[in-house]
Regions:
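A short, histidine- and acid-enriched strand-loop-helix "catalytic/donor-clamping" loop
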Residues: 151-167
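Nucleotide-sugar-dependent
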Residues: 237-240, 286-292, 300-330, 335-348
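N-terminal subdomain of nucleotide-sugar transferases
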Residues: 1-94, 247-252, 430-433, 439-442
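An aromatic- and histidine-rich active-site surface loop
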Residues: 129-148
């Protein structure tokens, strides 16, 4: 018997098709000023409206200003006829896709999501849908795409919003996952958590790194110096991370260069605190420059959650693996110092592969870790360990790998399963209530 949710979608589909996709409808036109949605078309996009589309659904802009953007571009690199759909604008810049649209104002009911999808894709044909979900919007939009166009649906989880924290309802996630022919996650803990909860197979696709930047041979160790110095990469996902790290580093007698987004729309990243901590902010720089810069340091700091009561959302922090960790070790083999809880995915990753150390938000512990990691023998050991796994983290051929995997409904090969063979993905979860109001849908 048809599940009531699917039955509801079937009714919506036929009703909206009659309204929006009837044969007598006029040809699709670009929305004019004041229209609900504006579709931005790339100068290189085909004019053939019968071309099969690869639709990519994200929460916000695909841009270099946050970690998701570069990764989305890498895994979809070279795909033809990409139509990028997002729920909202947060960064002021989007530079991805042959066509892109922001579905704002956001849908409030299931019917509105169906209508929005059919409005922007009227008279088009969709082959595949790649969904990188974070908000409820991405789930509903992807369900509508799958139902209305019969496209193959792939989910690529980069962050958790359902298992460790309940920002997305279980019923919605279950409906969405049941529709997916391929389910991917960036790391084993995220894979296992969703696999265990929903009884559906997930596979791993890590945050791959540009092949042109991947270092093949072990990089040389750097000579020791009297003053501690290193780099800082990654994002601050909670104000407490920033405050704690600045406080810790201010007592470590160190010089740190920060390469990352210093203008967060959500947190107060005080320049005064940076100066006191010995941190020089360089902002976001092109990845090829970042790879060269990282080769100049004995270690790189990546902040993660402390997983305590000072944080606003330990659930998201507990199940996330910062992609910049993989970027650093693959491009420069630089040892990684995780500052935060040893129970986070970042800490587990560096310990499993022997590419770094973990220290809590404590100045004595962080100073001692910096000193140990700067010693020649530690440099040699960690850089050799990084060199062993770097080639597997390359994005060489990854867009073809993903396209083929979506087509057959399983990983095209076992390269990533082999990489994480023997990896302990079990993780202690303390489920949290929602801290954000997902759109109230019915």
């Amino acid at each position: 018997m048809l599940d009531p949710v699917f039955a509801q979608n079937k009714v919506l589909r036929h009703r909206l098709f009659d309204l929006v996709l009837n044969h007598g409808a006029p040809p699709i036109q670009q929305p004019q000023a004041g229209a609900p949605f504006t579709i931005v078309t790339s100068p290189t996009a085909t004019s053939d409206l019968t071309a099969l589309l690869n639709v990519v659904v994200t929460a916000n802009e695909v841009t270099h200003l946050h970690g998701t953007g570069p990764l989305v571009k890498r895994v979809c690199g070279g795909w033809p006829n990409v139509f990028s759909i997002r729920a909202r604008n947060d960064w002021g810049r989007h530079d991805f896709g042959d066509w892109n649209v922001c579905l704002s104002p956001r849908g409030r009911t299931r019917a509105e999501f169906f209508q929005n999808v059919l409005t922007v894709l009227r008279n088009r044909n969709v082959r595949n849908v790649l969904c990188i979900p974070f908000l409820a919007d991405e789930f509903y939009t992807s369900i509508a795409l799958h139902e209305c166009f019969g496209a193959k649906l792939c989910v690529y989880l980069m962050d958790d919003q359902n298992v460790a924290t309940h920002n997305i309802p279980d019923a919605l996630v279950r409906e969405f996952l049941n529709r997916c022919s391929l389910r991917l996650a960036t790391h084993p803990e995220l894979q296992k958590s969703y696999q265990d909860k929903y009884g559906l197979r997930f596979s791993v696709l890590p945050a791959v790194v540009p092949a042109s930047l991947t270092a093949r041979d072990p990089s040389p160790s750097l000579p020791s110096t009297e003053q501690r110095y290193g780099a800082l990469i990654g994002s601050f996902w909670d104000q407490s991370w920033y405050d704690r790290l600045c406080d810790v580093l201010s007592k470590c007698d160190c010089r740190i260069d920060w390469f990352g987004n210093t203008k967060s729309p959500w947190f107060n990243l005080s320049p005064k605190h940076l100066r006191k901590a010995g941190i020089t902010a360089h902002g976001v720089i092109p990845e090829h420059q970042l790879a060269r810069k990282l080769a100049q340091y004995p270690f790189v700091i990546v902040p993660v959650g402390a997983l305590d009561t000072r944080e606003s959302n330990t659930g998201v922090a507990r199940l996330s693996l910062p992609g910049r960790i993989l970027f650093a070790i693959a491009t420069s083999h630089i040892p990684v110092l995780i500052v935060g809880s040893e129970k986070t995915c970042g800490a587990r990753f560096v310990k499993h592969f022997g590419v770094g150390e973990v220290a809590p938000y404590d100045s004595s512990a962080v100073s001692a870790a910096m000193d140990r990691m700067s010693r020649p023998e530690a440099q040699r050991r960690m850089r050799q360990a990084a060199a062993k796994i770097a080639p597997v983290l390359s994005d060489d051929g990854i867009s073809d790998w993903l396209a083929k995997s979506i087509e057959v409904g399983e990983p095209a090969d076992m390269r990533f399963e082999d990489l994480f063979s023997g990896y302990d993905a079990s993780i202690e979860l303390h489920s949290e209530p929602s801290i954000a109001t997902a759109v109230g849908l019915r």
